Amino acid sequence: MATKVAEIKTLKQGKYLVLGGEASKITSISTSSPGKHGAAKARIEAVGIFDNQKRSLVKPVNAKVDIPIIDKRVGQVLAIMGEEVQLMDLETYETIDLPIPEDLKGDIAEGKEVEYIEAMGNMKIMRTKGGN
């Protein structure tokens, strides 16, 4: 589980953080100052990368949260086996079996290159690369 730590005030929409043990992408972030002597609070709405669950968090802006280290890679489709696809990583040449995302079912074909991410021990195909 590769993570690093950052303060909430450094986070922006579109960045990633760990909520509920899952790597999540921030969809909205807002801050509010409660009053004269209170610390500013941040409300974060995020969606899980791998499970698509909505999560929210309310904490002071100077609180620390875990940030997942996300590795974006490129692989070539070797074989399509029903609902799964077998990829070969183009850097390490290792083969990986991953499920095909619903939105990419028609786009993935043998020999095509796809981008996939690896974070916290999970992998997911994100998109197909153009030109193939």
Curated annotation (Swiss-Prot):
Keyword Cell wall biogenesis/degradation: no
GO MF, one example: translation elongation factor activity
Disulfide pairings: none
GO BP, sorted A to Z: positive regulation of translational elongation; positive regulation of translational termination
InterPro entries noted in UniProt: IF5A-like, IF5A-like_N, NA-bd_OB-fold, Rib_uL2_dom2, Trans_elong_IF5A_hypusine_site, Transl_elong_IF5A_arc, Transl_elong_IF5A_C, Translation_prot_SH3-like_sf
Residue numbers of Hypusine PTMs: 36
Any one Gene Ontology cellular component term annotated for this protein: cytoplasm
Coiled coil ranges: none
CDD domains: S1_aIF5A
Localization of this protein: Cytoplasm
Described purpose of this protein according to its UniProt entry: Functions by promoting the formation of the first peptide bond.
Similarity remark: Belongs to the eIF-5A family.
Protein name: Translation initiation factor 5A
Gene assigned in the entry: eif5a
